[in-house]
């Protein structure tokens, strides 16, 4: 015997993928011998269910299980004792079962090697059909003993050579759903949709392949028959899609928590048509928009102020509520509705405040890439965190501004004046909202770029952008380092040193005045010492 035949005789077939595997690649811990690849693919916790489903489908198709060579003598006893227990099947094997059903797959192996001993309760003892003549072979290929579209085997290559062949039509590289469509697998070849049990899958499989159950499958399937099956399958998928849409309409009347749970379940088990279409169905987006009170109130809150003087009818926030956006694709609507959740209500900042609101939607849509949307959401999150307290609308972003800020803190400071008014409806104070809406540019704040230059409260000299002392209680109290040093020396650095303005500014939320910490005093005074040393030298 050749070395290839010897190697092939040592291999055992996996119950799920039917590929010849070496003994060390097989796992005997489950109800059927399966290879490590299938266990890793499905997960050890799901593999029993998959084996069970495979067994049901094989029985429903009248599938002869005589293809797999038996296990090695050392493990045959364990396999025969476990064969009476039930096993399972994966999404990827359903596609293979549809076209290998009744097919003469045993030809390849039995033509090259004598059949190994088989367990009587699992494997039939019928003789394989004789090899086909060369004139009968078509364009179909057989990879690892698995028949591809037209069902012809190609026995001139040993299985282990086929395993390594760089065949582009290898079943592992074909999408599972497409393989199922080509090869005549039942509709349930993806993960089981909601509401479909294994029993109903078996019934559907038996119905769709009843033409093939009368003995062996013919050598070739006519193209008209194939097209008819394809149409039948497409109709079934469209019916599934219609069921999901009607379900989504029924959910509108349910409570919000129930509706959200149902939505999440539907998205995680979406059928073929919603998985492979480019745009998600707009019905779900609009029902989400229409039933989200937070997004409505957010859009109303955002509509109170406008950073640019366009008339109300052209504002971007009006179009965000789902009524006035016929031109907006469903994917963009989904993106906007995500960003309109209560913690990120900032409609005007989704488009640049200086851009022309009357431009066609393509311009705004192309300008907003998914990455830009992610960055924007991250910036908004930072801004919300920084201005959590309604009474310190701006001071929180400046509390640590005596040290050079990181780029993320600069982003927070830049976003703050735009974010704060849009958060007011969810629990801020109306006085700050009125101040922000009436004079959005009048605050002497470092967070507004290109605005009024920062000046020291005492000497009115212009301050550097990051190198000054900021009172944490009063936003307008900003001091240069020379004035701060002078104030510390006047108050005496040994005791409590309060705000350089001369007032005892209370901490936010209490009557206790804030005072410099010793480390801060040392830092401010240290600059003075360094300057003197430089002058002396």
Swiss-Prot record:
Organism listed in the record: Xenopus tropicalis
UniProt biased composition (Basic and acidic residues): 224-259, 270-281
Protein name per UniProt: Interferon regulatory factor 2-binding protein 2
Protein's gene: irf2bp2
Lineage: Eukaryota, Metazoa, Chordata, Craniata, Vertebrata
Residues covered by region (Cys-rich): 456-503
Domain of life: Eukaryota
Chain intervals with Polar residues compositional bias: 162-176, 335-366, 389-400, 423-432
Compositional bias annotation for Low complexity: 73-84
Region called Disordered, residue ranges: 60-186, 208-366, 382-446
């Amino acid at each position: 015997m050749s070395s290839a035949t010897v190697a092939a005789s040592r291999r055992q077939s996996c119950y799920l993928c039917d590929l010849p595997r070496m003994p060390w690649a097989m796992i005997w811990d489950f109800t059927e011998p399966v290879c490590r690849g299938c266990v890793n693919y499905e997960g050890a916790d799901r593999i029993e269910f998959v084996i069970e489903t495979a067994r049901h489908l094989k029985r429903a198709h009248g599938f002869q299980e005589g293809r797999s060579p038996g296990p090695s003598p050392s493990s045959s006893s364990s396999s025969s004792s476990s064969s009476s227990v039930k096993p399972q099947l994966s999404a990827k094997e359903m596609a293979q079962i549809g076209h290998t059903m009744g097919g003469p797959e045993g030809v390849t192996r039995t033509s090259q090697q004598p059949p190994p001993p088989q367990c009587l309760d699992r494997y039939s003892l019928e003789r394989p059909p004789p090899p086909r003549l060369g004139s009968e072979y078509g364009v179909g290929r057989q990879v690892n003993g698995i028949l591809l579209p037209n069902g012809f085997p190609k026995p001139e290559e040993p299985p282990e050579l086929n395993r390594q062949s760089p065949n582009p039509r290898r079943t592992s590289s074909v999408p599972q759903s497409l393989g199922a469509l080509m090869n005549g697998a039942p509709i349930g070849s993806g993960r089981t949709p909601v509401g479909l049990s294994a029993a109903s899958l078996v019934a559907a499989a038996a119905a769709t392949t009843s033409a093939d159950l009368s003995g062996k499958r013919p050598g070739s399937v006519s193209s008209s028959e194939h097209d008819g099956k394809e149409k039948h399958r497409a109709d079934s998928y469209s019916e599934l899609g219609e069921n999901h849409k009607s379900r989504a309409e029924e959910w509108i009347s349910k409570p919000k928590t129930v509706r959200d749970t149902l939505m999440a379940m539907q998205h995680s088990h979406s059928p073929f048509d919603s998985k492979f279409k480019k745009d998600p169905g707009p019905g779900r987006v609009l029902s989400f928009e229409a039933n989200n009170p937070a997004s409505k109130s957010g859009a109303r809150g955002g509509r109170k102020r406008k950073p640019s003087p366009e008339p109300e009818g052209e504002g971007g926030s009006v179009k965000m509520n789902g009524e006035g956006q016929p031109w907006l694709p469903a994917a963009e609507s989904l993106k906007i509705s995500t960003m309109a959740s209560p913690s990120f209500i900032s409609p005007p900042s989704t488009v640049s405040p200086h851009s022309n609101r009357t431009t066609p939607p393509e311009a705004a849509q192309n300008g907003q890439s998914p990455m830009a949307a992610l960055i924007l959401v991250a910036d908004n999150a930072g801004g919300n965190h920084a201005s959590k307290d309604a009474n310190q609308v701006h001071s929180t972003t400046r509390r640590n501004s005596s040290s050079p800020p990181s780029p993320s803190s600069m982003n927070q400071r830049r976003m703050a004046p735009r974010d704060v008014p849009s958060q007011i409806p969810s629990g801020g104070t109306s006085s700050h909202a009125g101040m922000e809406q009436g004079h959005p540019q009048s605050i002497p704040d470092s967070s507004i770029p290109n605005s009024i230059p920062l000046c020291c409260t005492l000497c009115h000299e212009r301050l550097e952008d990051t190198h000054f002392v900021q009172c944490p209680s009063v936003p307008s109290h900003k001091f240069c380092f020379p004035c701060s040093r002078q104030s510390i020396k006047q108050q005496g650095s040994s005791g409590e040193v309060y705000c350089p303005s001369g007032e005892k500014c209370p901490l936010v939320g209490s009557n206790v005045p804030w005072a410099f910490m010793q480390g801060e005093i040392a830092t401010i005074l240290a600059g003075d010492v360094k300057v003197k040393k430089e002058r002396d030298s």
